[in-house]
């Protein structure tokens, strides 16, 4: 948050409302946070410019769209120099089936989340990644059976509450 404007209660309420209802109209957002539309829009624009709001997007119901499989993959790199991490990260960002990638501390280096048409497509993806010599030493795959919790909103009020 260095260099970013300090958030007040109304800013936090705007962020919280927008992450739950990204397509809310400015008039309805203003009403929800207790402002008139013009100052509300000014605040939203300020929050966008400051980088607090990165994007607006639709959540697609994949079950309705197509059969698919979600796979979580633990990846350990063979070498642990900065250039090895940079190479892996730059290449993995390019792969459309990788929907999340996290650098971790602990027993392995990365946790990736893949979405693919099926297990066979996932295996083809992994073989292709291994063939590209990205420095992968080993990987372990975990097929998701069903989602139990899938939150796409974070507890903003809890994270910024300093009391």
Regions from the PLM with identified roles:
Residues 1-163:
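A compositional/biophysical signature of low hydrophobicity enriched in polar/charged and small residues
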């Amino acid at each position: 948050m260095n260099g970013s404007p300090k958030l007040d209660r109304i800013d936090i309420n705007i962020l919280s409302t927008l992450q739950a209802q990204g397509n809310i109209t400015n008039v309805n957002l203003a009403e929800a946070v207790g402002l008139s539309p013009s100052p509300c829009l000014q605040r939203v624009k300020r929050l966008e410019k400051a980088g607090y709001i990165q994007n607006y997007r639709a959540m697609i119901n994949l079950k309705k769209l197509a059969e698919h499989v979600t796979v979580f993959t633990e990846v350990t790199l063979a070498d642990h120099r900065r250039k090895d991490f940079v190479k892996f990260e730059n290449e993995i960002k390019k792969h459309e089936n990788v929907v999340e990638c996290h650098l971790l501390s602990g027993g392995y280096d990365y946790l990736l989340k893949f979405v693919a048409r099926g297990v066979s497509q996932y295996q083809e993806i992994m073989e292709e990644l291994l063939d590209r010599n990205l420095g992968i030493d080993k990987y372990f795959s975990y097929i998701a059976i069903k989602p139990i919790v899938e939150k796409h909103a974070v507890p903003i009020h809890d994270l910024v509450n300093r009391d």
